[in-house]
């Protein structure tokens, strides 16, 4: 319990945000069900004609879903979980501020729910317009409680926004410029700026409403020289950016999902970034399009009509960039991809109807009609991020897969700093592909470390662990459960453990050039346990496997390794083939002979496909899909199996 109350770990706090959002979603859904039951048939149904109660339920539903479900989930939950991982930061810039920004939300939700039970409840709608929210219409304490709830929620969001902005600007990995940030990080960054600029205006508006109700001021009371339209201007100066606060994190999520399941980088990265910034800036300049029906003068309506239509330009850039990302890609129609495609379709419809409503004269005619509600609902992004996880493996399978990945493309390093102290690193380098980046981010979120993209040497993504606590907590226990099976990694691990437990610099310089000297004497390491070897082999193929469609029409799979004859022999036996090639070539760096298993028969390659499809998690999976699609015989043989998956 103490861990969760006092935690300053970004992932713990992200988990708390997500749990809180699910709890709030259940409350909000319960209110929604009551509304739908009442509207299910003409006339009075369940609320006995109590219109105030109906308005209270509407208000509570809106506040709960906006301030306690969508914002905590998308910004607090996914933001805390993914932003530090994506920029290579160990945590957020202000961990304790992160903690308090979450723990302000439960009392805020309690205050909001309490407002529904004080006297007749707050039946003002989520806009809380005066004079309906004034003393004459709501004389009890319900609206005051709702205002205090919004204050707490707003403070929470502003603290979180400051934290995100500082983290993104100051805690990126060396070499990660702003133009290399993942799009989801940009989305959270833009959202944080919008929160920081818009929430103080809302706070001022509802504070003036509070003083009108309790301290005899008349900011919004015409009898004292006030104007209720002032409240509408202040509220919608917050309210329209709030729409983008809800949708922009969804933009970032959809960009990653579309990229990952298309097997391509996002089309027009810079255009996507500047489109998000443009949407954020323009969002502050169009607030009065929510107020066409209150009697604005014609010049004001003309300006807001033009400004609102301009927002369609950056929005269109984003939609066409998503479509261009899909075009020509190797599409995998998974659950998150279906959500993303549904979002693009609905968002396009919502955006087009929004352009029509931007026209002030049409908006007045269509005001309070279902057309307007449909516009907003169609712009809502869906729950694809909840379903998007590159790995469908159990933790036991993932452990073996990660060790296989390290055996293939990883290295355990012991280095010195200025001949004084020893440094310890785990490094895994893969090709610079979006799905490899996503896969390594997920692995890093479980086992620790940082992931970053490097542009030199043709580009690659790299997962590094260099923190002794992380080694002690996750990496070394992983190797004790799942032994590496290549002689290279076996000797690296032995060398690593000698100095990890006793960092003797003099002994290090004495032994560092001889750690591979006994490689010939290493006994066969492959694990005979079929389940472990099968899962380990998935990670090893992700690193070292090769799928080739030959110009003659045939298809083959091959995997090679320096020195480890017995390991390659075990792979050959696992796939039930008899052919093992001993190449005359020697490894460029190691100088050891190269052993290779090559499988070209239809039955053998089909066996490999059946084994690899559930296990591969990165770019090799895309290669395998293309490999199958280019071969008619493989496509025919594996069709039923792939459909089942």
Curated annotation (Swiss-Prot):
Protein source organism: Mycosarcoma maydis (Corn smut fungus)
Transmembrane segments: 15-35, 56-76, 99-119, 145-165, 183-203, 234-254, 266-286, 304-324, 337-357
Record protein name field: Probable intron-encoded endonuclease aI8
Main location group: mitochondrion
Enzyme superclass (EC): hydrolase
Free-text description of this protein's post-translational modifications in UniProt: The mature protein may arise from proteolytic cleavage of an in-frame translation of COX1 exons 1 to 8 plus intron 8, containing the aI8 open reading frame.
Cellular compartment(s): Mitochondrion; Membrane
GO biological process: aerobic respiration; intron homing; respiratory electron transport chain
Region called COX1 intron 8 encoded, residue ranges: 369-645
Function: Mitochondrial DNA endonuclease involved in intron homing.
CDD domains per the UniProt record, alphabetical: Cyt_c_Oxidase_I (cd01663)
Region spans: COX1 exons 1 to 8 encoded: 1-368
Gene Ontology molecular function terms on file: cytochrome-c oxidase activity; endonuclease activity; heme binding
Lineage, top ranks: Eukaryota, Fungi, Dikarya, Basidiomycota, Ustilaginomycotina
Family: In the C-terminal section; belongs to the LAGLIDADG endonuclease family. In the N-terminal section; belongs to the heme-copper respiratory oxidase family.
Annotated EC: 3.1.-.-
Lineage top rank: taxon: Eukaryota
Keywords: Endonuclease, Hydrolase, Intron homing, Membrane, Mitochondrion, Nuclease, Transmembrane, Transmembrane helix
